[in-house]
Structures are given as structure tokens and as C-alpha cells.
Amino acid sequence: MKHILLTNDDGYDSVGLKALIDALSPIAKITVVAPANNKSACGHSLTLDKPLRLISIKDDFYKIDDGSPTDCIFLSLGNLFKEGFKPDLVISGINIGANMGEDITYSGTASAAMEAVIHKIPAIAISQVCQNRCQDIQNGWEFELAKDTIVKLATRILNNSFPLDERKFLNVNIPPIKPNECKGMKITKAGFREYGTDSDRHINPRGEEYYWIGLHPLIWKASEDQSCDFEAIKENYVSISPIKLDMTSYDDLKNLENWLNN
């Protein structure tokens, strides 16, 4: 039986992770290693300044005490899988909230997939786009479309092959709709966000300032060809983006060389 390693960045008790386990358990052996706490927007961070504990919750289900999603993949491969054996597929999610455009660089969900493909394991990051600061998700969202989508993708990969070369992964975003409202899956490029530096400033009872980041609405740039991830979501498509780890700007290598030498 094929073997899938699951993780996330919302924590081991997230409803999105539970939905992922429910969806994939019938088609593969599942091992879960997830952060003990919410690690949203932690990026591709690896914990180097303190020891980590791999804590067994039940059979094939572990949490890492204060670890990141990247820690989860790294420690899993070195300690839970016998030498010479790797999972057939790593899936990170189901994230509560979108991971589109440059958000991928902040995302713990996407970073777990990055870590997997560094170790030459096919990987998918899957995120559920939500509304109203994700209160719809927290209040009993069924993840029906997300579960349908991930089963289709995982089955195709496990029965055939991964469609991307090494050091590339699939970034999947699910619109906040029912399966019968979905127009299908669309292959997309990562879009662009209009980033600001807004934060919410407050004063605590001791008169000290504190700030919350990430409470303001997301604003996206429209693309001319309507082929980016957030536009697919807006049109009720599942967005599937191929993402590569090589961030070299090859178009600029020659120009940069000329700039440096002249």
C-alpha cells in the first residue's frame, strides 16, 4: 500500500488536518506529523536554537512540540522512516485560509511541501480559501470540495507519476463553495498581492503598545490574461499552481553581468 506523510501549519488538532486524514485514509497508509501549535506564516523555518520533541498521540500520529512544518518533515524522514524508505507523497494542509501569490513565501503549509521536494519526495500544499476572517471554516466547514480534490490528485499521483520535475510542488487552493458549484480545476500561475504595512495598534491596561498583523483584507492585482490563482478562485475554479524552489532570475543573469563589469 502506498504511504502518504501529512502535516500542516495550523497545528495537529486543526479541522483541516482532520479532514485530510478522513479523505486519504481509504486510499493509502497515513502517517501524520504536525506542529503542536499554530505555526501559520512561519515560512520555511527550521528550529536550530532548541531541542524538539516528537510526541506520539496515537499510532502513526505525532506532534512536534513547538516545531515548524519544516521541522515536521525533516524529523519525520530521519526518525520515523527506515533508512532507504520514504513516503510516496507528502501533503500539507488543509490550510485554513488561502496561500496564493507571494503568500507562498510566508506560508508554513507551502514550506512543508518545499522541504519534501528538497528530499526528492513529491508534494502538494492544499489550502481552503475562506471568508469573514475564516469564521466560516472554524464554525464547521465540511471541506467537501477540498477532500474531493485531494483524493483525485493523490490517486492520480500514486497510480501514475508526479507531473513535475524535482524541486517542484503543487500548490492547490480551493474556493469557498460546494462541490456542485465548482467549475473544475484550472492550472494557474501565482498572482500578485498589493502589499501594505497596515497593522492594528492597541494599548494594554499597563499603557504599553502592541500590534496585530494580518487583520486587513487582501487586495490582489488583476492579470491581463486572467490566468493567476486568485482569479481562478474568484471564478469558482480550483487553482493548481506548479511552484519551483529555484528562484534564480535567469533573464537577468547577462544584464547583471554587464552591469557589474561596465
From Swiss-Prot:
Class of this enzyme: hydrolase
EC number, as in UniProt: 3.1.3.5
Binding residue positions for a divalent metal cation: 9-10, 40, 95
InterPro entries listed in its UniProt record: SurE, SurE-like_Pase/nucleotidase, SurE-like_sf
Compartmental location: Cytoplasm
Gene Ontology CC: cytoplasm
Function according to Swiss-Prot or TrEMBL: Nucleotidase that shows phosphatase activity on nucleoside 5'-monophosphates.
Protein name according to UniProt: 5'-nucleotidase SurE
